[in-house]
Regions:
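Short, low-complexity N-terminal intrinsically disordered segments enriched in polar/charged residues
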Residues: 33-63
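A short, local hydrophobic-aromatic micro-motif
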Residues: 32, 101-104, 147
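Short solvent-exposed beta->alpha transition segments
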Residues: 67-116
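Second-shell loop/turn segments in exported
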Residues: 41-44, 55-56, 73-79, 124
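Exposed beta-sheet edge and beta->alpha loop/turn motif
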Residues: 107-152
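Sec-dependent bacterial lipoprotein signal peptides
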Residues: 1-32
Length: 152
């Protein structure tokens, strides 16, 4: 009987991991704001302020304060994912990488939606941690709200 219970628990754990992966994939699909990458940041964006906002979001991420990351986002970003779901996806990454050291590379770019009507600012930031690196892909709208916060 206990063998059956163990198998059921193993299956439940597997289903939970699959659900987490699907949540992450859905987040990527829904929140991808950069459909058309450009070489230059749109003139309406302040690159310095955009980087400050991205660094603030990464700071919250490093503190595992996922609700604050969500609060920095646009309405769609905030409605799509809960802080608990964010934690399920990101805690293992942070636990594996260890303590944050520094941002080693930042690249900014311009983005447009599929229709080419709305411009966004995109950032790719590479961060060193004790046990590896994390690459952040962050998209910000003209109101300096997060449209996308992806972690690799």
């Amino acid at each position: 009987m206990s063998g059956i219970i163990e198998r059921i628990m193993d299956l439940a754990g597997l289903l939970e991991r699959i659900a987490g992966m699907l949540t992450g994939l859905s987040m990527v699909i829904l929140l991808t704001g950069c459909q058309s990458l450009g070489a230059e940041l749109p003139e309406s964006f302040d690159e310095e302020r955009m980087e400050e906002e991205a660094l603030r979001a990464i700071g919250y991420f490093n503190e595992k304060d996922y609700q604050s990351v969500l609060d920095m986002g646009c309405t769609e970003f905030q409605e799509f994912l809960t802080a608990e779901e964010f934690a399920e996806q990101c805690d293992p990454i942070l636990d594996k990488r260890g303590k944050f050291r520094e941002i080693v590379k930042t690249v900014s770019m311009g983005c447009k939606n599929e229709e080419g009507e709305v411009e966004y600012g995109g950032l790719v930031l590479v961060a060193d941690y004790e046990d590896g690196r994390i690459c952040f892909h962050i998209t910000i709208n003209e109101n300096m709200e997060l449209m996308e916060f992806l972690v690799q």
